[in-house]
Amino acid sequence: MVKSLHYFILPLIGNALILNTPPEYQPGYGYVGPACAVFDSTLFLHGVSKRKLNDHELHIFSSYQHDLSAFKDSSSSFDSFEASFPTIPKFCGGYDDSIEVVLDSCIVRNNHVYVGDHLIRPLTNFEKQKIQLVKMRRMYGESKRKRSKRSSKPLPGTRPQRDFSEMLHKLLNINSTVTSRFLPVVSQSPLFAMEGPWQNLFELGKDKDMIELLAASQFKPQLPPVASVPVAPVIDITKIDSPYRATFTTMKPRKSQKPEKKKEVFNVFTTKTNPQITTTTMTTTTRTSTAIPTTTTTPRQISLQTIPFSTTTRQPNFDKTKTPATMPSASSSSLSSIQTVVDPIILKLISKALEKNEMIDEYSLKQALSMRNVATTTTPLPLRFILPTPAAPNPFLPSTRVGGLSHNHLFIPHQPFTTLVSTDSRYSAPNPLSHRLPNEICRVHMNSNPFHF
């Protein structure tokens, strides 16, 4: 009786283990692209890297790409019928560069099912539609990405150089045109293409806690009087001596505008007057008029390279009720003493973030400004950028787009189609069905296939 139970229980356990085990896919499972391709001087067959090619083989592959492009051009014209298909390189092993789909245990290429190098059968019409749908979804995702990139306006966080210039303009009050000219390498860093905490830094002026911290900071420039401001409406940035040192002035305000006594503490360069309300009472009527608020912009000088020690000391404020005549040469002396308006604490945070490839959150900025000491306030740090090291140019290295008779720009090595959406941000799935591959094409003849192993 016990032995008979073994005959019934053991097969059930074996079937349960077989059903619960995940399918073992071949290395190139989910690959959509040419059967033979060269990427970064590496030979790929069915999406799997095989070996590095030597210089002679790379030269042969480059010649093949050139001849293939010439064959396409000649075959599209009506007056040329003598063009022949170029010879496929020998290292491709007889595979052409036509697009294929690698499934769980077979490969679909040219509307036929292959297991290894053996031709099994042609596809049915229904299976052809499934394979064509996989290719169309892949092409649709790429074309949709390119079309949206051309037509749509750039969102915040998608243009690194512009966003970094705006961040410097908000935090350090630096002209955006200067940062765009002297910091073009920032666009090569993926750090500033992110959204989130960087965008929160643009709204520092709206936070009450941050206003108090910035108000307590001693790195507030002394504003010169408005009376004798030189007029320089146009800034020629080509005449700047140092690429990291910018000196410029803005337009001269009108003489009728008088600076207000009370100023907002979070904006050290712009004085914004409150609306003035004048009430005139007559015998029968009362008239109320509201003046438009005015904004007075004062000149500033900026230095990103060094921060002189003299700028960290506070100068006594002049009485604003005095006329400019009672203060001769006050404008020139204060303008020459104020050279930088950059807080070293902010520079230090940005420098550390660039070195560690991290982002600055609002909490760390508040904590750094609240815990300032003598060492941090007297030792400034300049901005430091991590430049990506470009690879050495290789004349034999082909581009990422592999030429061929089919859509070879879909080729991405080591990127299976099932995990492409989550691992590669360049492509986006048009719908959830993109993850499903027609693996039943291989399972139809899997048991009866003599070449399956």
Curated annotation (Swiss-Prot):
- Disulfide bridge partners, by residue number: none
Q: What is this protein called?
A: Uncharacterized protein C30G12.1
Taxonomic path: Eukaryota, Metazoa, Ecdysozoa, Nematoda, Chromadorea
Q: Where is this region: Disordered?
A: 140-161, 311-332
Q: Which InterPro entries does the annotation name?
A: Pepsin-I3_sf (IPR038412), Protease_Inhibitor_I33 (IPR051901)
